[in-house]
Amino acid sequence: MTGCPANLPLTHAPGQQHDTPFQAVVVEAHHCHQPQAFYAQLRQQGLTAIHFIPQLAAGDAALWAEFLCAVFHRWVREDIGRINILLFSETLSAWCGETLTQPGAPAANSTCYGCPWLRLCRCGEQEDPLCAGYRQFYDFSGPYMRVMRDLRRQQRPPEALMPLLR
């Protein structure tokens, strides 16, 4: 069922301290038009570990970016430490210097080597059709990720950022 969590135990985010499996949540174009409402629905359902899976057309990179940035905007102000979103956790881990590549994953292709966000993505043999959307998300989330990385370096939890944004 799209737009609803699938009861699929997925991987745990780097540094995740509990055993809550990620819930796969399929994101379609209509969810991208109301990202705040969709995220509020997931919160209301009590999800605490989410893996967004885009089910979008190749030309929908801007929609994907809009969705990710809107959800991140709310999450960074209200839900750090309460709701674990896999993409956000992996992005923060990359900002903290952790390697995100999985064993056996294909190497980045030559079109990706010049990308300033290569260290954050898991591109494979070909560029993701939603790559522009991910890049826009990385641009948007970068300043917040930088602060959360610095908080971790100071032995403080990333959620210490939330009061600063209110």
Question: What residues fall within each predicted segment?
Answer:
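Radical SAM enzyme [4Fe-4S]-AdoMet core and its adjacent flexible, acidic
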Residues: 2-103, 107
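Flexible mid-to-C-terminal extensions adjoining Fe-S/redox cofactors in radical SAM and related proteins
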Residues: 104-166
